[in-house]
Structure formats: structure tokens, C-alpha cells
Amino acid sequence: MQKEPEVSRRGFLAGLAAAAVIPRWAHGSRADIVVTMPRVEKLYKIAGCTQPNDLQFVPDGLWVLDQVDPNKAFKVRPKDGSILETLQTESIHGSGITYGHGALWIASTKMTDPATPPRTLKVDPKTGKTLKSWVTPGSGYYGAITPKSTPSGAHGLKWVGENYWMAVPASGKLFLMAPETGEIVRSIPAPGVRTHGLAWDNGLLWCVDSNERAIFKLNPADGTPLTKIQLKKDDPEPHGLDIDKGVLWYCDAASGWICRLA
């Protein structure tokens, strides 16, 4: 059995090094991509969900993951945010939710014990209990790092076909994962430092960079940015992301807003 990684001073220093990494396209093709600034519609806030951190549309509603610990997932009516189901999960500081193989898949971005590596959870959508879990690859440190920082795991998750995409900011990558084994199928470079929500759009992958208040459309073959949506400073900050009928929706864990691009 593969030994799970431990948090250590070596890991902390590795995180410092990773934080300085600049994407390979930062001074090249990214400067040439099309930038749009659509209007943001602030739709609603969900009662009892104060820090919505990711979104997943399903045929009978919209799943919203609340970051307040321990995390609850709310299934709501997309048109008005009225609650259909409330699910208590075992996730801590969760930042990603998706649905596939009859289960919810949730990124437990932190753990109750900070020395424990963050994990990705397969969750029973009726009980909220964890069915399986795997150590999240690429977990570590990013952004403003101090000795008191704790490792950060996955942020956005999005099911595509028989696998799911996962954004892990500390790694500087987006991983395509085999769900039932937790193994990496492949990876592509992330479009920014604080990558978050993901959405699948007719063979292309949208990815949020929360720090830049931007959403990038990527070629999932190699991570090349094709389009950039730039939000304004007074718009809610993008965290979670999904797409419905060709329209991007996002949520902001800081303000609580569920938003849609117009």
C-alpha cells in the first residue's frame, strides 16, 4: 500500500518554491487571448448556506457546497434558491463538489487534524456519509504562506465522462482523476495561482482564478487558455462554477451570492 504523504518542514519549503512558479504561458500566448467582461446577475442567497463554495447542476436541481465546517451540501431549485434537500457531510472547509456514479464527490480542502493530508470524498447523496476517500494529489501550500499555514487540497471538481477534473492550487495543475481508484489519469497546467471552480463546455474546460477574479476557457488537452472572462472589482468574487444551458453560474463564499453571467 502506498504511504500517504505527511506534512513537514520539507513540505512547507516545497510549497514556498511552488508558489513562485509562473505558468509556462504567462508571458506568451495568454496575452493574446480574447477577453470579455459580461454583466453579472446576482440571483439569490441560500437560507442557511452562508459560504457557498462550489456548484453542481443535476437533473433535479443544483447542489451547492457550504464551506462552513463541517460542510453541508444544499440541493436547491435553480430558479429561486429554495431548498430541496440539506445534507450533512464529513468534509472540512470543502471547496469542490460534483456528481457521478450515483454519488457526490467532495473536496475536503482541509482536515480536522492539520497534519493529515487533505482528501477527496465519495459521498452518499442520501445520508452524507463518506463511502470512500483518497489523498488529494498535489496538496500543499500556495499564495501567502506562513509557518502557521496548513496544507490545502482540491478546490473545484467537475465530472466529465467516466472521470472528474480537479483543481489543486498548491500543485499549479488541474488533474483528470479516475474516480474509483483516486489515480491521476493526466494533468494540465493551471491558468493561475488560486484556481477554483470548473465547468465543462462542449469539450472545453472553464476554470476560475479567484485571485484574478477571472474565468478561463482552456483546451483540456494541454491547458492552453483560449478565452478569459474578466469580472469587475465590485462583482462578487468567483469561487465555485458550473454551466447550465450554455450559461455560466458561479458562487462567492465571501458574500454568499449565487450569480449568473448575462
List the predicted regions and their residue ranges.
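N-terminal secretory signal peptides
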Residues: M1-V7, A18-V21
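A short helix->beta-strand "capping" segment at the edge of beta-propeller domains
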Residues: D32-G48
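A short beta-strand motif characteristic of beta-propeller blades
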Residues: V40-K45, S82-L87, L131-W134, Y141-P147, ...
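Beta-rich, blade/repeat-based domains predominating
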Residues: A47-V58, S91-H101, S108, G138-V160, ...
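Conserved beta-strand positions in repeat-built beta-propeller and related beta-rich domains
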Residues: V64-D69, I106-A115, M166-A170, C207-E212, ...
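Structural motif
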Residues: K72, P114-R119, I258-R260
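Short loop/turn segments that connect beta-strands within beta-propeller blades
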Residues: R77-D80, D124-T127, A178-T181, N219-G223, ...
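Blade-level signature of beta-propeller repeat domains, shared across WD40, Kelch, NHL, RCC1
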Residues: G240-A262
